[in-house]
Amino acid sequence: TSPLEHRRELNQATDLCFGLLPYGLFGGYAIMTFFAPLAFPEAYLDGTHGASAVDVFTVLLAGWGLTLLATPTYTSLMAGQHPWRFTLFILLVLLAAIALGFVLVLEGPAEPGRKLYAAAVASSLSAGVLLMLSWWMSGELEVVRHRRDEWTLVFIGGSFIIAGLVSQTLWWTLGLPLFLFTKQGWKAVRSTLD
């Protein structure tokens, strides 16, 4: 593939990820909220054991979102001209996950419920490291910079969604503009079908 075609495909993949993000965050939360009472005893939902299952899942949704957003550059790194970088990438993400787990879980709170919540936070932060490393190691940082306004909206909107859902406040409404990426997402899907 030519560099121009590669950039076009990377932008289309990013458009698709931007378009999927709000649906995944809100859809995942809605599914968990609906099915959690069917799958878990009340003690896992009311905070008896520390963090509720819904709270833990909501924090993990942040990690899902960050992993989704890393997909285009992660894939570019994996399929790039220097496959050894992908091995180094995996090693660095693993080391970051171990460090975050050590600090937040092993050295963190003593109560088991809080440890579980801390583990979810560590997992989501590891996904953030994965995203940042995929940008840097794939050599696609310029493509990301070129779309910095969109990335800023995605990060701010996604943060408001997660913060609002975790705190059960209306902060999530400030993430609704992410649905504006739906049209770009559909356009990206249609272009892959042509």
Locate the predicted segments by residue:
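Membrane-embedded alpha-helical segments of multi-pass transporters/permeases
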Residues: L25-T33, L38, V59, I98-V103, ...
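Membrane-interfacial segments
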Residues: F35, A39-Y44, G108-P112, L141-H146, ...
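Specific pore-lining/lateral-gate transmembrane helices of multi-pass inner-membrane transport
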Residues: T1-I90
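Membrane-interface helix-loop junctions in multi-pass transport and translocation proteins
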Residues: V54, W84-F86, I90-M132, A163-P177
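Short, surface-exposed helix-loop/turn micro-motifs enriched in polar/charged residues
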Residues: H6, Y117, V143-H146
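Alpha-helical transmembrane segments
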Residues: T73-H82, L133-D149
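Hydrophobic, membrane-facing alpha-helical anchors
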Residues: L60-T75, A120-W136
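Membrane-proximal transmembrane or re-entrant/amphipathic helices at the cytosolic face
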Residues: V143-V154, G158-D194
